[in-house]
């Protein structure tokens, strides 16, 4: 039986999320037979999910920002080897009471993997997310103009990161 509530709550929900991933890797037949994983964190409906996934061309797909210290993770693609050798070893560093979130730990793992030769790319475009409140179980209001700005920013960011000068 899985007990996902064994840890100090001050560590945060990211700590619990990683514990779920670790448990799945160790106990799930499906996870043990799979080589690539797609994670959608949070209570999200990603409206352009298929478009993002159909345009993944590298081993790792993840957005990273805030001077490469924050791996924004509404939709990520990770190979199992990355999860086992980079992501899970960083897991114990999560402590939201100290400002160390799962996104910070994920960025450390991502940068270590890139330094070791993994290929990485930004998402094809920014995810268009319909978010659901965990407290009220209601959808947050979507702002179409905001989504358009985010989409164009993501295209520019991808161009700058991936252009060969």
State where each predicted segment sits:
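ER/Golgi luminal nucleotide-sugar-dependent glycosyltransferases, focusing on the catalytic module
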Residues: 1-165
